[in-house]
Amino acid sequence: MPLNVSFANRNYDLDYDSMQPYFFCDEEENFYHQQQQSELQPPAPSEDIWKKFELLPTPPLSPSRRSGLCSPSYVAFASFSPRDVDDGGGGSFSTADQLEMVTELLGGDMVNQSFICDPDDETFIKNIIIQDCMWSGFSAAAKLVSEKLASYQAARKDGGGRSPARGQGACSTSSLYLQDLSAAVSECIDPSVVFPYPLNDSSSPKPCASPDSTAFSPSSDSLLSSAASSPRASPEPLALHEETPPTTSSDSEEEQEDEEEIDVVSVEKRQPPAKRSESGSPSAGSHSKPPHSPLVLKRCHVSTHQHNYAAPPSTRKDYPPTKRAKLDSGRVLKQISNNRKCASPRSSDSEENDKRRTHNVLERQRRNELKRSFFALRDQIPELENNEKAPKVVILKKATAYILAIQAEEQKLISEKDLLRKRREQLKHKLEQLRNSCA
């Protein structure tokens, strides 16, 4: 399908500059005329005074298509066969026109809206966005921009010296593109200059190869074909790139943005720049496990179940066995609650509440036992045996009188017993005398 059907004679500067959208509050009023009159004469009492200072509500101008030819779709332009362009009459277009056609087709205007800079400028390396760790995800995008700019510059230099004839075939175009790619790789920014420490093993950009490296030399055809199929740098070895299918520029940009998301919260390991450059070289076949660093932050759980040594010793008393089990269970629960609150300043208050509660339990137990004793005493008094509502004072008085009566009767019985014993003794003596007289 020829790509220059509808893009043959289009001037993008005129299209964007001549059709600027303007927004008016009312279509019938003359905005410029009203503004000029408001500048010359003061506003009427019924007129809004702020209309005098009102500006034209125009949106920001779009960047010129001619000034930003560093579009990321240049890689996609080099990937398709130039035979389609030549067959469709594309031989009369320059390299810039073909780049604009591919940019319009793919809609790749990311670079014009985000990064418009010169890769040879020293301020590009010292840019605060690159130096900032929060914006370090844009370093790979900036590197991509520098590669595209370098490739476009090489294409312009070669395009100025070439003849207008473009019927050489796919081999010449692909070799030219590979030379531009090697030039772009040689001019890219070394991440070791910008980032002395790696941000992440999977997302950190690898240092670019030198211009004299064999990985990007035009003599090695297999590696160059793999670089043509995937023009973006990858953390994996270059030998594995031959099996990867060719991808478009938009897909590869989305994949790179997904891969280079950086977790700002986590604290990653730090290696010296020498070791990082050795581990990040393309000749490394496998990623070694990073050594443990003391800078890694870990969350640990501190147990709060500790004994409160500052608490005063509890004074235990010997209680009856029937109530000791309940008191022990209550103390166990209270000790658990006190251990949970050992770090709070209310530990002494909780201990006082525990002692007060224990005292209340013991007092209630004493009162219950006293009541049972009164009931037992009432049952022993004949006058109050069947009186369940007898007060304690009456029970005590009747009990005292009953005890005194019992004691008096006891003394009477004791004296009577003594008299009977004496009488027995007398009778026994008299019986003995009678036996002796009969004998």
UniProtKB/Swiss-Prot annotation:
Query: Residue ranges under compositional bias (Low complexity)?
Result: 209-238, 279-288
Major subcellular site: nucleus
Where is the protein found, in the record's own terms? Nucleus, Nucleoplasm; Nucleus, Nucleolus; Nucleus; Cytoplasm
- Motif UBR5-degron per record, residues: 355-364
- Entry-annotated residues carrying N6-acetyllysine: 143, 148, 157, 275, 317, 323, 371
What InterPro entries does the annotation carry?
bHLH_dom, HLH_DNA-bd_sf, Myc-LZ, Myc_transcription_factors, Tscrpt_reg_Myc, Tscrpt_reg_Myc_N
UniProt KW Glycoprotein keyword: yes
In Pfam terms, one family for this protein is HLH
Checking SUPFAM superfamilies in the record gives: HLH, helix-loop-helix DNA-binding domain
Q: Where is this motif: 9aaTAD?
A: 100-108
Q: Which UniProt keywords apply?
A: Acetylation, Activator, Chromosome, Cytoplasm, DNA-binding, Glycoprotein, Isopeptide bond, Nucleus, Phosphoprotein, Proto-oncogene, Transcription, Transcription regulation, Ubl conjugation
- Locate the bHLH domain: which residues? 354-406
| Composition bias type Acidic residues, residue spans | 251-263
Q: Where is the composition biased (Polar residues)?
A: 335-347
Task: Supply one GO CC term from the record.
Answer: cytoplasm
* Function, in words: Transcription factor that binds DNA in a non-specific manner, yet also specifically recognizes the core sequence 5'-CAC[GA]TG-3'. Activates the transcription of growth-related genes. Binds to the VEGFA promoter, promoting VEGFA production and subsequent sprouting angiogenesis. Regulator of somatic reprogramming, controls self-renewal of embryonic stem cells. Functions with TAF6L to activate target gene expression through RNA polymerase II pause release.
* Identification of the protein by name: Myc proto-oncogene protein
Organism, as annotated? Tadarida brasiliensis (Brazilian free-tailed bat)
Phylogenetic classification of the source organism: Eukaryota, Metazoa, Chordata, Craniata, Vertebrata
